[in-house]
Every structure is written in structure tokens, then in C-alpha cells.
Swiss-Prot record:
PANTHER family: RNA 2',3'-CYCLIC PHOSPHODIESTERASE. It comes from the Archaea. Keywords: Hydrolase. A motif (HXTX 2) lies at residues 125-128. This is RNA 2',3'-cyclic phosphodiesterase. The keyword Cytoplasm does not apply. It is an enzyme of class 3 (hydrolase). One of its GO terms (molecular function) is 2',3'-cyclic-nucleotide 3'-phosphodiesterase activity. It holds the Pfam family LigT_PEase. HAMAP family: RNA_CPDase. A motif (HXTX 1) lies at residues 40-43. The keyword Secreted does not apply. Its EC number is 3.1.4.58.
């Protein structure tokens, strides 16, 4: 199964991100926007894993989750990968993400022991859409600039989730396989 490890975002943040997607729209570029219910912060993309690996990963995540406290983060601003001149992914930034960075690093280190490739530099973000092609580079840049410091609200990071991703012609369908609450 295709899987990843993620943090879920609140309903109010989802609403704000959908409004940003609507604002960006599709006039300046053909963008495949992420569905509202699929917004998340990826801690690690795993790719194809077996049931056995999933069980190993669950044990690791359970152990890691207990070490960190639930905490509030703020979702603010729009960024792009790889760079503003060549926009492929549009994302919302996450502020106050020091704990998330630590969690991601620990997951990365632990899973490297199981043979997963190490990620390197982690940027906490919520993907809004993937750009297929740009029709009006300047127009798109202007819209993204206007959202550069937009506040999308805050939410409490409560758990780490192991998610399964099933690719369909309509887009991916995510299913939570296991959820590990952070400590109070």
C-alpha cells in the first residue's frame, strides 16, 4: 500500500485554505487543487509499504507520539516549490513548528533504521495545489504575493497519523490506518 505519515488540520483552517484556493483560482494557471478533506501536514512520505512494515511503523510512531505534547501552531502565508520562477507546488506555511520539525526528524531517523530513505531538510507545510502549467506567470505571482502573509488560523496538533493513499483518476483517497495522540 502507498502510505505517508501526517498531522491533520482543523476544520476552520480547512475552510480558510479553501477560500485561498478559490482566490488563486484557475485563470492564471491550470492547478490541481487538493480536496478540502485531504489537507494535512506531511511528516514523511513512505511510498509503497507492506503490512509488516506498517506494523513496525505503528510501533515507532506510538513511541514518538508519547514524547511530545499537544501544542498550537499557526497556518500563515503562501509559499511555492521549487521556486517563484518555476512554480510546481503551492502551499500554506506553518508557524511555531519547532516541535513538528523535531517529530519529523525523529520519524526520519527511526525509519532510516528500517531502510527508508532519509529526507533531509523538512519544511512544515500544507499543500494547496499542484501546478500543471502556467498561463499568466505575472498574474499568478501577483495573486500569490497578495496571500504571502495571509493568516489561515491556528489549530492544536493532537496526533500523528499513518495514512494510506489510494490513487484514483479523480485524485487520491486518504484513509487513516492508525492515529497516535500526543501527550497532554
Amino acid at each position: 500500500m502507498r502510505a505517508f505519515i501526517a498531522i491533520d488540520v482543523s476544520e476552520s483552517v480547512r475552510d480558510a485554505l479553501v477560500r485561498a484556493q478559490d482566490y488563486i483560482g484557475s485563470k492564471e494557471a491550470k492547478i490541481k487543487f487538493v480536496e478540502r478533506e485531504n489537507f494535512h501536514i506531511t511528516l514523511k512520505f513512505l511510498g509503497e509499504i507492506t503490512e509488516e512494515q506498517a506494523e513496525e511503523i505503528k510501533k515507532i510512531l506510538e513511541k514518538i507520539a508519547k514524547k511530545y505534547k499537544k501544542h498550537e501552531v499557526n497556518v500563515r502565508g503562501i509559499g511555492v516549490f521549487p521556486n517563484p520562477n518555476y512554480v510546481r507546488v503551492i502551499w500554506a506555511g506553518v508557524e511555531n513548528d519547532e516541535i513538528i520539525k523535531k517529530i519529523a526528524k525523529e520519524i526520519d531517523d527511526e525509519l532510516a533504521k528500517l531502510g527508508f530513505k532519509k529526507e533531509g531538510n523538512f519544511v512544515a507545510h500544507i499543500t494547496l495545489g499542484r501546478v500543471k502549467f502556467v498561463k499568466d506567470k505575472l498574474g499568478l505571482a501577483m495573486k500569490l504575493k497578495e496571500l504571502a502573509n495571509e493568516d489561515f488560523g491556528s489549530f492544536i496538533v493532537e496526533a500523528i497519523e499513518l495514512k494510506k493513499s489510494t490513487l484514483t483518476p479523480k485524485g487520491p483517497i486518504y484513509e487513516t490506518l492508525a492515529r497516535f495522540e500526543l501527550s497532554e
